[in-house]
Amino acid sequence: MLPLDGVTVVEVSSFVAAPLCGMTLSQLGAQVIRVDPIGGASDVQRWPLAASGTSIYWTGLNKGKRSATIDLRSPEGHDLVQRLITEGDGIVVTNAALPWLDHALLSAKRSDVIHVQLLGRSDGSTGVDYTVNAATGFPLVTGPVQHAGPVNHVLPAWDVCCGLYAALAVVAAIRRRDHSGAGARISLALEDVALATAGNLGLLTEPQVNGTQRQRLGNAIYGQYGQDFTSRDAVRFMVVTLTGRHFRDLVEVTGTGAAVAALAQALKVDFTAEGDRYRYRDVLSGLFATWFTDHDADEITAALSNTTVLFERYRTFAQVAQDPKVTDNKLFSVLDQPGVGDYLAAGLPAAFDGEHPRSAPAPALGQDTADILNQYLGLTASDIARLTSANTIAC
């Protein structure tokens, strides 16, 4: 039994954050009904696509859900979605700002409704991961030190964080409702997620209390010693020493003990202190780099594996997909996804009692419409035929 078995959630969404929230809840055992307009929302054909034209992206974020397609512009379509929410478990997650889907209207129909509204910005204005990220400061400290302009990271970090915060909010609201009977109106802004993260990590506190701001470091790690190195056969490694022992092992394995000691004496610093290791990271990296360029990747891996040094080689996505960390990992299982094919798909990263909840295939768009309307609203075959002929639903 999974934690959310027996819970039904209606999701009216698109793109990353809200679908990720719904998929996370599904992996925890909830029955998640994704409602889309007829023909699909604006993310239904988002790249990458499989050879069949099916969106790998869309199926990846909607695994394990059920799909209903309804005319979201018609009053009858509005009524169907409202009923699915209020006559079901009274839980909806959406990133769509639709008047007919707002909390006040739904709570008038069901007082304990749990309504989670994802926003771009807290004032209701539009914001997406890429624009929110630009306003947070992160692109100006990302990338090579010599680079003058901003560098966007590829990971839609704020969408991912927002989706997981939203899933947490749903679980917390269910817990509260179970104890008090109260519903919840939850708003979660993408920009607030990014700002809170920057604040919690000290990036906004630093200029307020110290009058300083973070600078671009390339692949170095702020406040610690960490750097990337290249092997003789052109394989790049990320090497991190968080503790004194890590650093001592790196010095020993690279045979730089005498040089590091002489450097410490010349600079009158103590490399057992992480602050000094960080301040003089460039000259230390110069000492260590020779050892890396004198050895092949396999030699480096073998040598560092016998130490406490934290390291990993950089890999492409294609290399990762073939690595035992994927192919021999219980997190992944073979998924037969219609339109895409068989592939190793991740389940829920959290293992419950040693087992990762597995993913089920994403639905075809609208494949469950008739079954959902019959199961939750009691609509008959003739009702569904009438709604289909009126283009209120698509099955």
Task: Give residue ranges: language-model regions.
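Short, well-structured beta-strand/strand-turn elements
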Residues: 32, 305-319, 379-385
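Conserved Rossmann-fold dehydrogenase catalytic segment
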Residues: 147-155, 178-194, 216-219, 269-270
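A short glycine-threonine-serine/GTX helix/turn-capping micro-motif
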Residues: 151-161, 185, 216-217, 224-226, ...
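Aromatic-enriched alpha-helical interface/lid elements that frame and gate functional surfaces
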Residues: 225-307, 311
